[in-house]
Structure formats: structure tokens, C-alpha cells
Amino acid sequence: MAEISTDIAAMSFEEALAELDLIVRRLEEGKGRLDDSIVAYERGALLKKHCEAKLEEARTKVERIVSGPDGSVALQAVDNV
């Protein structure tokens, strides 16, 4: 599979997901040319990969607030979500 292009790499999660959704809808209609559908499918796969990477990045940043026995509050990274 091709590397994620610069334009996709610069996208936010929301932008990539919106474009991926648009591609899926177009492919489901099945009205386009085969060659165009293949190009769209490949781009969709790259967008999916980008979205998964963004979600993983966000997951590693998630923290939860933990209350200590003395009432103190601390942040603890979530290991498995």
C-alpha cells in the first residue's frame, strides 16, 4: 500500500473521516468508472489508516483523574482503553 500523502497527513481526524465517508457513499452508489473507483478505494484505505493513527495517538494521550486516599487528585495515563 502507498504511503500516506502529504495532504492526508496534514488532515485532522474529522477532515479525514468526512472525506472517507464521502468516498464510501460514492463507492456504494456504484455509478462511477472502475478506474475512478479503484483510485477512490486506495485513497479511502489511506484515509482509514490515517484515522486509525489519529485515534491511537489520542488514546495514548487520554488520562483519567485519580483520587488519592488523602483526597489529593492526580492524573494517571490509561493503559488499556
From Swiss-Prot:
Cysteine-cysteine disulfides: none
GO molecular function: exodeoxyribonuclease VII activity
Main location class: cytoplasm
Biological process, per Gene Ontology: DNA catabolic process
Enzyme class at the top of the EC tree: hydrolase
Cited InterPro entries: Exonuc_VII_S, Exonuc_VII_ssu_sf
HAMAP family per record: Exonuc_7_S (MF_00337)
Annotated family: Belongs to the XseB family.
General function of this protein: Bidirectionally degrades single-stranded DNA into large acid-insoluble oligonucleotides, which are then degraded further into small acid-soluble oligonucleotides.
Protein name per the record: Exodeoxyribonuclease 7 small subunit
Gene: xseB
